[in-house]
Amino acid sequence: MGRMFGTDGVRGIANKELTADLAYKLGKAGAFILTEGTHRPKILVGMDTRISGDMLESALVAGILSVGAEAICVGVIPTPAIAYLTRKYNADAGVVISASHNPVEYNGIKFFNKNGYKLSDELEDNIQALIENNFKDVPVLTGENIGRKIEEDGEAIRDYIDFAKSTIKGDLKGLKVALDCANGASYITSVEAFKELGAEVHVINNKPDGININRNSGSTHPEDLIEYVVKNSCQIGLAFDGDADRCLAIDEKGNLINGDFILAICGKELKKQGRLKKNTIVVTVMSNLGLDIAMKKEEINTIKTKVGDRYVLEEMLRNDYAIGGEQSGHIIFSDYNTTGDGLVTALQLAHIVKESGKTFSELCSIMKELPQVLVNAKVPNDQKDIYLKDEEIKSEIDTITKNLDGSGRVLIRPSGTEPLVRVMLEGENQGEIDKLAHGLAKLIEKKVK
């Protein structure tokens, strides 16, 4: 069997790939591995608004209870809320049933350890090994040793809203905000937090029906929010994904503001407050070169990691950095939470807009995004490193890099799931880099034939 866990837990089409049987096994194995040696462990369970959530929750919880753990079910709640509340409630682990920004037919199961962090590869492998070994040496419990399910009555949502509000000083009175909840897990928390802080709140896509999560809405489809912000003269628009661990923004002119701009604006603000540890932000190799250029002007360092918020977080923890994230809107504020948190990000941005006295578009002028071109080159899986070995390809990359002369770059990334490498070029001239990227992709394809 291949590796069960992907970069963000176990994910697949619900009832076909991610079945109730698999959810039961994950609950049983996860509870056993994560709570070994604890007398009566507590595991927090939350989910997004997908129709398959109830089915998977029932199965997952059955697995948790079968090994003697208690399952505290908090219902529909954002992923970052589970990360935070696992710590706050001194739970032994947390689990979220969600497929984030994916369409409704997908679902996923993601574990957090007792400190609110995603699991290490090693722990995930231990969970998978236990399932594959058919739960060898796991005792069969009976009678009073079986765990209980505890239905939580709304306190968790209240605690998370209070926590999110506490991450800004002051209020948002006088700010006109539009929120797009993607018909997902943030449909209560984000709206309440902004209202309680005094903002004038306008909301779209906050009526989940089990099947409309992420449908033409949220951070993956911000078109409706863009139109809404402009039409209703809002000062800022904020779009969440299905489980609200990411956030993208819209300025008052209707421009989409991605995670690079959010990192630039928040990084500058943290520096101003003397809270930007080591004067550094953590980004991935896919962040726009324009962010590096902007941060250099602000005398802020950028550290680059592999793509994926787990790698950003690893780097932040290793060197105690305060902020990091991705273009997609996964932004991590290590002073506040242990994972990307859409609501915390949204509140920081809104607060900066209010306190600055500037328009959001003026704040975004901190950075000029360089044109970026991405071309896929088809390459057999066993030849994905050809760009590191072939002399002609290496020479072409060097020539392009030299010609871009510091105002652009070449980045080649092998796909982790498909037989291709991604050729990415950035530079000031869109036409020029488009031609160069396609030329380089063709050369790579020619060399593997």
Swiss-Prot record:
GO molecular function: magnesium ion binding; phosphoglucosamine mutase activity; phosphomannomutase activity
Keywords assigned: Isomerase, Magnesium, Metal-binding, Phosphoprotein
Annotated binding of Mg(2+), by residue: S100, D241, D243, D245
Cellular component terms (Gene Ontology): cytosol
Signal peptide: none
Cofactor binding summary note: Binds 1 Mg(2+) ion per subunit.
Matching CDD domains: GlmM (cd05802)
Record has Isomerase as a keyword: yes
Modified residues (Phosphoserine): S100
Names of required cofactors: Mg(2+)
InterPro entries reported in the protein's UniProt record: A-D-PHexomutase_a/b/a-I (IPR005844), A-D-PHexomutase_a/b/a-I/II/III (IPR016055), A-D-PHexomutase_a/b/a-II (IPR005845), A-D-PHexomutase_a/b/a-III (IPR005846), A-D-PHexomutase_C (IPR005843), A-D-PHexomutase_C_sf (IPR036900), A-D-PHexomutase_CS (IPR016066), Alpha-D-phosphohexomutase_SF (IPR005841)
Enzyme class label: isomerase
Any one GO BP annotation for this protein: UDP-N-acetylglucosamine biosynthetic process
E.C. number(s) listed in UniProt: 5.4.2.10
Entry annotated with the keyword Acetylation: no
Catalytic residues in the record: S100 (phosphoserine intermediate)
Catalytic activity: alpha-D-glucosamine 1-phosphate = D-glucosamine 6-phosphate
Post-translational modification: Activated by phosphorylation.
Job of this protein: Catalyzes the conversion of glucosamine-6-phosphate to glucosamine-1-phosphate.
Family designation: Belongs to the phosphohexose mutase family.
UniProt cross-references to NCBIfam families, sorted A to Z: glmM, PRK10887.1
Name the record gives this protein: Phosphoglucosamine mutase
Organism encoding this protein: Clostridium botulinum (strain Loch Maree / Type A3)
Lineage: Bacteria, Bacillati, Bacillota, Clostridia, Eubacteriales
Recorded name of the encoding gene: glmM
